[in-house]
Amino acid sequence: MEDQMNYYRFSREQWKQFYRNNQHQVPLTAANLHEIEAFNDRISLDDVRDIYMPFAHLLQAKYEHYLSWRETESVFLHRQNRQSPFIIGVSGSVAVGKTTTARLLEILFKYLYPDRRTQLITTDGFLYPNAELKKMQLMERKGFPESYDMTRLIQFLNDVKSGKPLAKAPVYSHQTYDIVPNRFDVITHPDILIIEGINVLQLPSNQAIYISDFTDFSVYVDADADLIEDWYLERFKALMKTAFQDPTNYFYPWAIGDPKDAMAMAERVWEEVNLKNLNDYILPTRNRADLILHKVAHHVIDAVYFRKY
């Protein structure tokens, strides 16, 4: 990633110097990290110390400022200061590791604010069910902006941000590659909500209100497209030997067939779907993020970009 005019660029060594307070080191172990890693992603205790603890410290400051501003605003408007969650958006390509980043941020906030409710959802649940995608002839466009029920997603975020005591988000299954009928993640008055998905920073032309209108801080997980392709195909190969072996899995027919055919299919999906989606709709949103985590080989974060203005 080239240097951007509106971002400060910090090397890993520079970034880790911004927070050296050992009193707030989260008691995580390598085993804990393994539990939250998305499949085939990698994260280490060094990453937590060098990258995520400074990041969490920054978010802590942003959160405290947010609470202060909410109080100031309510006094000025002569209105009751209703609970409205601090929302963090996490975006990036398929297979880049944004899920792991979101899960780790959830753990860090739960540690830093044990008396506050932190919850995490993904925008996957707001994809249209496969049956509807087929009716709309959009199965080959799954993951593209038009495959999401944006009206429902925006209404959900509005309910949460408005302080409604309960909001329901549909659940997506990577096992069946579809929305799970009548199953929901229940969001109950969170103080902090992390929302993760490829479309968190997008500005759909048919929407007057965007996901980013509800977020108070956003992070984009970035890497070279060739690296992401490698990670995507590595993950697919690994899943062929594990989750895809389950007869109920959507990809089971590929797992029991010719491996060469399966890999050819995965490569086609990368080229025609994921790479196109990245180049046309995801990567152009990168410069809307407040912070960019840049990865190199082996999912190592080598640089952090922080928005100037």
Swiss-Prot record:
GO terms for cellular component: cytoplasm. The keyword Nucleotide-binding applies. It holds the Pfam family PRK. One of its GO terms (biological process) is coenzyme A biosynthetic process. Pathway: Cofactor biosynthesis; coenzyme A biosynthesis; CoA from (R)-pantothenate: step 1/5. It catalyses: (R)-pantothenate + ATP = (R)-4'-phosphopantothenate + ADP + H(+). GO terms for molecular function: ATP binding; pantothenate kinase activity. It is found in: Cytoplasm. Its main location: cytoplasm. Keywords: ATP-binding, Coenzyme A biosynthesis, Cytoplasm, Kinase, Nucleotide-binding, Transferase. ATP binds at residues 92-99. Its EC number is 2.7.1.33. HAMAP family: Pantothen_kinase_1 (MF_00215). Belongs to the prokaryotic pantothenate kinase family. This is Pantothenate kinase. The lineage of its organism: Bacteria, Bacillati, Bacillota, Bacilli, Lactobacillales.
